[in-house]
Amino acid sequence: YTGGWREARQYLERYRELGGAMDREAYYMLGFSAYMVGDYRDAERNLARAAGPDDKLSQNASYHLADCYLRMGRRQQAMQAFAMASSEGYDEAIGEDALFNYGKLQYELGGGYFNEAINVLNRYLLRYPQSGRVPQVKEYLAAAYYNSRNYDAAYRAIMQVPHPDNDLKAALQKITYFRGL
């Protein structure tokens, strides 16, 4: 259902067109209403204006901005926005999801990010040890250690995964081999 958001967006756009003062909250509402109706480009423009100081509004704006970037295929920017949303501790659920996605994108984007992915994923495990995502985080962590050629740490990380899949078991065999060299 997007009807209420479409109407809210129309009123906010009309207010802006008539010269109404647009503060961060107004830009957030305009951006969020655009987000809710699937206009991610307009959402990006307005949510970016709402993000800024270290407060709850900025955390929410950064989080939804990150999702806009993901939906537009801009993963690097999404990673940066998730990093912002994860560092601000106002909404715990948003912080947890943002930190997970930040670590996941650090890992998936690869390149020189494996050490940073390891740091972010370890931070997730420290902050949210009871999360249902812990097994998935440990899989990413094991893969990041493997890709960084830290085979001892990769071995320890895989051994902590409760039910490793076949890919992880194959990685464990390779890691064991490389540890023996």
Q: What are the functions of these language-model segments?
A:
Residues Y1-L181:
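Acidic, polar-rich low-complexity tracts and alpha-helical solenoid repeat scaffolds
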